[in-house]
A protein has these predicted regions:
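Charged, glycine-rich intrinsically disordered N-terminal tails and low-complexity linkers that flank
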Residues: 1-57
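Mg2+/Mn2+-dependent nuclease catalytic core
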Residues: 45, 50-56, 60-133
Length: 133
């Protein structure tokens, strides 16, 4: 029997509240449909763009800088972790410290959050706060 398994990066969409009433939101319904299409047929409507390409290209540098700021020698996590309901692959995982870090690279100076409240708001809006729980 098929059992849906969500990616951590998609949890915010799955947990979106409906605009009115109770039940499942249109955003959550759409997210479930995307997961099922991928699981059953390998279909994915988003395969990246210039923003994700830049993030991938700068990922190693972002990990090194994150480590420098924390005084740690960090390296890219290559292991996907999962349980019965969710799956995900974080950028950095340090089990001895119970530390998970997911780096993000801004596209340009206009999209970079310079202030902590701005960074927190962007993370919340993008669903990263749910993803990292």
């Amino acid at each position: 029997m098929y059992q849906l398994k969500a990616r951590c990066s998609g949890l915010a969409d799955l947990m979106a509240k409906p605009k009115s009433g109770n039940g499942i939101s249109a955003t959550a319904r759409s997210a479930v449909r995307k997961i099922v299409k991928y699981d059953l047929f390998g279909y994915q409507d988003f395969e990246g763009n210039k923003y994700t390409e830049k993030g991938i290209a700068l990922e190693e540098q972002a990990i090194k800088l994150s480590g420098r700021k924390r005084g740690l020698a960090l390296k890219k996590n290559e292991e996907r972790r999962e349980n019965d309901w969710i799956t995900g692959e974080c950028d950095i995982y340090i089990p001895t410290r119970k530390l998970i870090i997911d780096t993000k690279c801004s596209w340009d100076i206009g999209s970079h959050p310079f202030f902590s409240d701005e960074a927190e708001e962007k993370a919340k809006k993008a669903g990263y706060t749910i993803q990292m729980q």
